[in-house]
Amino acid sequence: MQRSECSGGVQLRNRATGSNDQRTSSSTQMKHRTTVQRSKSSSLTSSPEAARRARPRPSDKLNPKTINPFGEQPRAPTAFAAIYSQGGIPCRLVHGSVKHRLQWECPPEILPFDPLLITLAEGLRETKHPYTFVSKEGFRELLLVKGAPEKAIPLLPRLIPVLKAALVHSDDEVFERGLSALVQLSVVVGPSLNGHLKLLLTSLSKRLMDKKFKEPITSALQKLEQHGGNASLIIIKSKIPTYCSICC
């Protein structure tokens, strides 16, 4: 009787031991699989192909990041982007093999400057393509039409604060577009710009301390003097005493 009980106890212990061995073996296999998967994942991440994808390519500069103005945006669009996507700007960007251009829905000569010119000036603060190109080129082409001075001069009180916003922008490219637009405007409106110069010269004076902007700002000031006359020179010198006149 004792032998039977002993034999039964041994069998139970053997079964328990076998079950423990199976669980231990199963756990070891799972750990091994996890280690292999992590190893594969690590090797894929550190592979030469992944490294090539992470490095920027020279062609990235030639193909700026573009937003689809008609697609879903991850964040609320700017005022200019919203107007453009709704067809409020009567022109579209045409991509060329060498350079881009604007295609107007109707001749720019018949378009009202109010509010189109101001809207394009507001777009100068955009930082993404195609808005940057559309605003800059649209502003330039609109000022080239016949009768531009008569259309632009009445808008100066509303246009100047918008240009100033571009000139005080922290983005260097936005500042450069604002500076270029200011020169284009001075060519068209001439001395009519003099009454608004003081509002703009403060931001130019601050940027003038940056070496990379010294030459383009000096050139812009010379254009302002050229088209604004002697009165503009007095205003420029009052805000930027170091400015050297083109008459010197």
UniProtKB/Swiss-Prot annotation:
Q: Where are the transmembrane segments?
A: none
Which keywords describe this protein according to UniProt?
Acetylation, Phosphoprotein
N-acetylmethionine modification, residue list: 1
Extract the coiled-coil ranges from the record.
none
Q: Where is the composition biased (Polar residues)?
A: 14-29, 36-45
Query: Carries keyword Acetylation?
Result: yes
**What SUPFAM superfamilies does the entry give?**
ARM repeat
Gene3D superfamilies to which the protein is assigned, alphabetical: Leucine-rich Repeat Variant
Modified positions (Phosphoserine) are: 47
Q: Where is this region: Disordered?
A: 1-72
Pfam families per UniProt = ParcG (PF10274)
Q: Which InterPro entries match?
A: ARM-like (IPR011989), ARM-type_fold (IPR016024), Parkin_co-regulated_protein (IPR019399)
Q: Which PANTHER family match?
A: PACRG-LIKE PROTEIN, PARKIN COREGULATED GENE PROTEIN PARK2 COREGULATED
Designated name of the protein: PACRG-like protein
UniProt source species: Mus musculus
